[in-house]
């Protein structure tokens, strides 16, 4: 079962992966100006956030992780965009508003001890997530689609996310990005996280009925992230998101609530890697 300490260590690993994956193409393709070498500023810092223990949970976990990335990430100014634990994007293509690249991350586990109604259903192992994204930027608008597939741990199926972002330049030192989105889940994903097999129903201590969800859209969400430069070196990040389960996900006997909230805050320090 993954708790705060273990999840924090995974965050460290993800942060390290960001550095390594950014460094490799920089040396190989002589694109150090894009990825943050040769004196371009980088940022080091940490995030603390509150997130549901599992999809459909009423209870929440408080987690934290450090990061290091090129300055400007999350503002369209970096080749790396950290959107979530399972959604760290690496922009490899950028042309006339179009951009695309691979993504990586981690999908956390769900333990049957996380909630009374999960007792008897068994654990779901987390694992490494890989995929790709593509998007098109028109002025302050950014339209994107991404695919996420877990390749280690349990085979939990694939997930497609669609999002529309709008960037607001509130002042020379403050940026706000608002977004709306939805996620389409494969039948394997839906069965893993929202389904109840006949065997699980028989073993369920809560007496959950058998439930066989189909592939489809599982949620809709709205969120905002503020980036505030406190001074030339220090930057504050504030983020919040609300999502609601829909379709078969909302009808699942596994969930405790259709509503989920996510909130986080971070602080970073800017420095020059090479002077």
Q: What are these regions, as identified by a protein language model?
A:
Residues 44-52, 77-86, 115-119, 141-151, ...:
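Transmembrane beta-strand segments that form the barrel wall of outer-membrane beta-barrel proteins
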Residues 42, 75-79, 98, 140-144, ...:
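Repeated loop/turn-to-beta-strand initiation elements of outer-membrane beta-barrel proteins
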Residues 40, 50, 60-66, 124-130, ...:
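Residues that define the transmembrane beta-barrel architecture of outer-membrane proteins
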């Amino acid at each position: 079962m993954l708790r705060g300490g273990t999840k924090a260590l995974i965050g460290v690993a993800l942060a390290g992966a960001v550095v390594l994956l950014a460094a490799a193409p920089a040396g190989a393709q002589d694109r150090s100006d894009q990825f943050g070498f040769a004196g371009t500023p980088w940022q080091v810092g940490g995030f603390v956030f509150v997130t549901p223990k599992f999809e459909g949970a009423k209870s929440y976990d408080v987690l934290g992780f450090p990061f290091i990335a090129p300055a400007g990430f999350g503002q369209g100014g970096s080749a790396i965009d950290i959107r979530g634990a399972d959604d760290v994007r690496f922009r490899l293509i950028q042309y006339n508003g179009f951009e695309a690249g691979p993504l990586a991350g981690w999908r956390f586990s769900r333990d049957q001890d996380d909630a009374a109604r999960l007792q008897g259903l068994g654990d779901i192992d987390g694992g490494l997530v890989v995929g790709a994204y593509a998007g098109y930027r028109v002025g302050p608008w950014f339209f994107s689609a991404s695919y996420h597939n877990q390749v280690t741990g349990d085979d939990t199926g694939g997930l497609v996310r669609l999002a529309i972002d709008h960037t607001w330049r509130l002042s020379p030192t403050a940026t706000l990005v608002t977004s709306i989105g939805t996620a389409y889940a494969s039948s394997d994903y839906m069965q893993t996280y929202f389904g109840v097999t006949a065997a699980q129903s028989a073993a369920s201590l809560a007496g959950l009925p058998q439930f066989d969800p189909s592939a489809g859209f599982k949620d809709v969400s709205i969120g905002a992230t503020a980036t505030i430069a406190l001074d030339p070196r220090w930057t504050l990040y504030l983020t919040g998101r609300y999502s609601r389960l829909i379709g078969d996900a909302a009808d699942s006997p596994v969930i405790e609530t259709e509503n989920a909230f996510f909130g986080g805050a971070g602080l970073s320090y800017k420095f020059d890697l090479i002077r």
